[in-house]
């Protein structure tokens, strides 16, 4: 069994950034991800250009059962800190609208930046790795994987939500949370596609992928 200080499951934006910060603090970190390609959702975000932050981000923009957490987290690391990191790597970006910042070139720039930060912090990333099960014994987490057994003092689950199953999204993180007695708020779909009848597809199908400024309302709510 391989021992380490921190195990992070999930190599998306949150997992990679968390691993970097732990590594900077002198912790030995291993990141596991089942995907072949890391940062899949990042690469798709913002139409492939990654809307990586918003200049007007505030704790007031978040809904939470613990509002103080958002306030505390955002006071310790602000959007300006992340923008400084992006600038440090020479990633060109622009404001699209309402403070939204997008890469000029491609979302891959952000993925490469996060991976470079992990490398600087000596984070060990193991992709194409399936998690078989997780146990807790003698004050350590034991993670059994397709690459063998690993144990750590700290465990971070950063597997994301249920959106985009084609990118590998699963209820894994929710199951682990329940296993360790962490309460789960019932999930609801937030972003959903239009589902069209076949005759409608024939008429407007060619419009797929075109973006326009629009407003929508339902029952006097928009």
Predicted regions span which residues?
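Short helix-loop-beta connector
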Residues: 1-3, 137
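Cofactor-binding loop segments of dinucleotide-utilizing enzymes, especially the Rossmann-like FAD-
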Residues: 11, 34, 189
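Redox-cofactor binding/interface segments in oxidoreductases and associated redox assembly factors
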Residues: 9, 44, 157-158
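Predominantly flavin-linked oxidoreductase catalytic cores and closely associated redox partners
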Residues: 108, 117-222
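Conserved N-terminal/central alpha/beta ligand/cofactor-binding core
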Residues: 34-124, 129
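N-terminal Rossmann-like FAD-binding beta1-loop-alpha1 element of flavoenzymes
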Residues: 4-31
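Residue-level detector of alpha-helix initiation sites
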Residues: 8, 12-13, 37, 161-163
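Hydrophobic/aromatic ligand-binding patch that stacks against planar heteroaromatic rings
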Residues: 17, 21, 34, 42, ...
């Amino acid at each position: 069994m391989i021992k380490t200080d921190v195990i992070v499951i999930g190599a998306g934006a949150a997992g990679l950034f968390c691993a970097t910060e732990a590594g900077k603090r002198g912790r030995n970190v291993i990141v596991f991800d089942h995907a072949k390609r890391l940062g899949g959702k990042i690469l798709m975000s913002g139409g492939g250009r990654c809307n990586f932050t918003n200049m007007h981000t505030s704790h007031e923009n978040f809904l939470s059962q613990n509002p103080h957490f958002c306030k505390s987290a955002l006071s310790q690391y602000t959007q300006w800190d992340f923008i400084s990191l992006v600038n440090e790597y020479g990633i060109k970006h622009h404001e699209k609208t309402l403070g939204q910042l997008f890469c000029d070139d491609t979302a891959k720039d952000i993925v490469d930046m996060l991976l470079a930060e992990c490398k600087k912090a000596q984070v060990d990333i193991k992709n194409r790795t399936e998690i078989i099960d997780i146990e807790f014994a003698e004050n350590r987490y034991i993670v059994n994987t397709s690459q063998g057994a690993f144990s750590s003092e700290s465990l971070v689950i950063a597997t994301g939500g249920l959106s985009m199953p084609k990118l590998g999204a699963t209820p894994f993180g929710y199951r682990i949370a329940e296993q360790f007695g962490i309460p789960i708020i019932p999930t609801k779909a937030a972003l959903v596609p239009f589902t069209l009848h076949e005759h409608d597809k024939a008429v407007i199908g060619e419009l797929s992928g075109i973006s326009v400024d629009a407003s929508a309302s339902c029952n006097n709510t928009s």
